[in-house]
């Protein structure tokens, strides 16, 4: 990421204890290819306090939050992120969530393009995290029966 000018992760975030807590909480999911982890994502019902200021379309429903999606550099551009998005949507539907919320760094154009392609709507404004530089954009996918990805 940093090599592409996308410094959303740094030595302050995410720290190893963040991932350790994700594993302990049972919210970190890994994807393997040929026995090796090629990517991870965190799926949780817990949102960062910064999300409270976002004007969500599904403000009263049960939402799933996707965090910390990371793909090993050798596996970039091989469909892993799309497979994670498929998994996230199926997981949300199977478990009765009405929407999915994600955020991404303002310079992470690849992530923004993928999120938009998947039917997420960018919410107005942005959020900031104290341990990170620059704003993050928030996105939401409503999982109603009439959405374009309804299954």
Mark where each language-model region is:
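Conserved GNAT-fold acetyl-CoA-binding loop/helix
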Residues: 1-21
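Conserved beta-hairpin
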Residues: 27-43
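Conserved acyl-donor/pantetheine-binding loop and adjacent beta-alpha core of acyl/acetyltransferases
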Residues: 42-68, 76
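Conserved acetyl-CoA-binding loop-helix of GNAT-fold acetyltransferases
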Residues: 71, 77-90, 113-117
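Conserved beta-strand-loop-alpha-helix junction that forms the acyl-donor binding cleft
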Residues: 76, 102-112, 130
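Conserved active-site alpha-helix within GNAT-family acetyltransferase domains
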Residues: 82, 94, 107-124
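Conserved GNAT acetyl-CoA-binding A-motif
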Residues: 85, 92-104
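Conserved catalytic-core motifs of GNAT/GCN5-like acyltransferases
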Residues: 103-104, 116-136
């Amino acid at each position: 990421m940093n090599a592409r000018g996308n410094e959303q992760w740094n030595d302050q975030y995410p720290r190893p204890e963040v991932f350790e807590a994700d594993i302990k909480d049972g919210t970190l999911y890994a994807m393997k290819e040929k026995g090796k982890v090629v990517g991870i994502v965190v799926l949780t019902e817990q949102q960062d306090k910064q999300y409270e200021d976002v004007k969500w379309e599904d403000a009263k429903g049960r939402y799933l939050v996707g965090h910390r999606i990371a793909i090993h550099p050798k596996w970039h551009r091989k469909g892993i992120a799309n497979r994670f998005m498929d998994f996230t949507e199926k997981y949300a539907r199977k478990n009765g969530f009405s929407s999915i919320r994600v955020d991404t760094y303002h310079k992470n154009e690849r992530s923004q393009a993928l999120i938009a392609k998947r039917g997420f709507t960018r919410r107005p404004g942005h959020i900031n995290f104290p341990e990170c530089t620059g704003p993050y954009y928030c996105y939401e996918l409503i999982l109603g029966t009439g959405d374009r990805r309804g299954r």
